[in-house]
UniProtKB/Swiss-Prot annotation:
Location in the cell: Nucleus
Native source species: Rattus norvegicus
Start and end residues of each stretch annotated as Necessary for interaction with USP2: 393-490
Task performed by this protein: Inhibits p53/TP53- and TP73/p73-mediated cell cycle arrest and apoptosis by binding its transcriptional activation domain. Inhibits degradation of MDM2. Can reverse MDM2-targeted degradation of TP53 while maintaining suppression of TP53 transactivation and apoptotic functions.
Organism taxonomic ancestry: Eukaryota, Metazoa, Chordata, Craniata, Vertebrata
UniProt name for this protein: Protein Mdm4
Length: 490
């Protein structure tokens, strides 16, 4: 029996180690009240996945119209089956903790149900083994003449049976306790994946269309824009804002050593538990720092309203959080950025004419002696005399003015070239800012890595925080990271 309990503990620990890869497709069995709600929303069967449970709950809220028409993240469930099950009158989708508490109480994993059935069968077999048969009763009746011998035999028979029962009960209690902890950890990890920044309302709303379960647990979600819009696939690669996989955490440079699952000792299990709790705390801290609710500077006046679905969004969001419509007049007030997005050719800046009204020729002029026109009759009669000294002085003055004009035109051309060069560099900087993060290649570059008097804007805020926590250097210049700040482009 000791070997049986040890093997059960090892198998339970192995299954706990595989939670990270199997928790997405975890099969759960809802209790009766929750099952009635799911069936009212169109669910069939008694075993579902976590995604299907969340989908049918959203369907139930949509069909019953329990949400507020103006602020659709508020759900009023008072006087309804859902309210009786939750034990509250209303809740917000942005803070779905009452919903998760209800699911923890009313969901049972299918693995634990199978284990309970196996334990019931084993206890029934032990009970049948302990019941005396008819032959034993007849044999005891024939030997009733010797009561001392019968009592001794009964004592010797009940002693190993009681010991076996005690061992069985202890092993069963250990197994049930371990399974309850395992089940709770599975559900906690499932809810930890969903509770990243609050359950988005558009996820529940858009699941009512084109919901087709597949073998790999993925579904297709169609946005509620026009018919010719793109299809978003519900996978861990596309929905990075809902699920952050372990591979993405390791890709940034944070390497965590995995715990040894084969070690059955209590010390190993406590270390594994500490590592899992530490990872949860880090993820909660990151989600709190990235969520819009923790930003105290953003007020309701700064939020922008979507023209498609009339939802108010954070000023730092480019797309609507519900329908993914592009924000109207996005970067319309920034002429340089609009120009860099529309065309790649940079138009020349008009030349600054300091000396307006002066005709500057393109080639060298031919200088000749000036023609003096007589103003009165006396000068008309008198022939003009040619003075070589005066003509030479005039030529020198003409040469000096020409050299000054050439120097000024050269300076103007040099200034124009330098301005064009700086403009080109600024355009390249704007184009680099528009590129995605150099590490995850998904999120925008909003994490400014500061080192000394310089900084680099090459990664997103999420990856920059992970680089700072892991003690890594700047990916651009390999300097030590001193501070990481989040940049909002307005």
């Amino acid at each position: 029996m000791t070997s049986h309990s040890t093997s059960a503990q090892c198998s339970a620990s192995d299954s706990a180690c595989r939670i990270s890869s199997e928790q997405i497709n975890q099969q759960v069995r809802p209790k009766l009240q929750l099952l009635k709600i799911l069936q009212a929303a169109g669910a069939q069967g008694e075993v579902f996945t976590m995604k299907e449970v969340m989908h049918y709950l959203g369907q139930y809220i949509m069909v019953k119209q329990l949400y507020d028409q103006q602020e659709q993240h508020l759900v009023y469930c008072g006087g309804d089956l859902l309210g009786d099950l939750l034990g509250c009158q209303s809740f917000s989708v942005k803070d779905p903790s009452p919903l998760y508490d209800m699911l923890r109480k009313n969901l049972v994993t299918s693995a634990s149900v199978n284990t309970d059935a196996a334990q019931t069968l084993a206890l029934a077999q032990d009970h049948t083994m302990d019941i005396p048969s008819q032959d034993r009763l007849k044999h005891g009746a024939t030997e009733c003449s010797n009561p001392r011998k019968r009592t001794e035999e009964d004592d010797t028979h009940t002693l190993p049976t009681s010991r076996r029962k005690c061992r069985d009960s202890r092993a069963d209690e250990d197994l049930i306790e371990h399974l309850s902890q395992d089940e709770t950890s599975r559900l906690d990890l499932d809810f930890e994946e969903w509770d990243v920044a609050g359950l988005p309302w558009w996820f529940l709303g858009n699941l009512r269309n084109n919901y087709i379960p597949r073998s790999n647990g993925s579904t297709d979600l169609q946005t509620n824009q026009d018919i010719g819009t793109a299809i978003v696939s519900d996978t861990t690669d596309d929905l990075w804002f809902l699920n952050e996989t372990v591979s993405e955490q390791l890709g940034v440079g944070v390497k965590v050593e995995a715990a040894n699952c084969e070690q059955p000792s209590e010390v190993g299990r406590t270390r594994d538990k500490k590592m899992v709790e530490g990872g949860k705390d880090d993820d909660l801290e990151d989600s709190k720092s990235l969520s819009d609710d923790t930003d105290v500077e953003v007020t309701s006046e700064d939020e922008w309203q979507c023209t498609e679905c009339k939802k108010f969004n954070s000023p730092s969001k480019r797309y609507c959080f519900r329908c993914w419509a592009l924000r109207k007049d996005w970067y319309s007030d920034c002429s340089k950025l609009t120009h860099s997005l529309s065309t790649s050719n940079i138009t020349a800046i008009p030349e600054k004419k300091d000396n307006e009204g002066i005709d500057v020729p393109d080639c060298r002029r031919t200088i000749s002696a000036p023609v003096v026109r007589p103003k009165d009759g006396y000068l008309k009669e008198e022939k003009p005399r040619f003075d070589p000294c005066n003509s030479v002085e005039f030529l020198d003055l003409a040469h000096g003015s020409e050299s000054q004009e050439i120097i000024s035109s050269t300076r103007e051309q040099t200034d124009i070239f330098s301005e064009q060069k700086t403009e080109t560099e600024s355009m390249e900087d704007f184009q680099n800012v528009l590129k995605p993060c150099s590490l995850c290649e998904k999120r925008p570059r909003d994490g400014n890595i500061i080192h000394g008097k310089t900084s680099h804007l090459t990664t997103c805020f999420h990856c920059a925080r992970r680089l700072k926590k892991s003690g890594a250097s700047c990916p651009a210049c390999k300097k030590e990271i001193q501070l990481v700040i989040k940049v909002f482009i307005a």
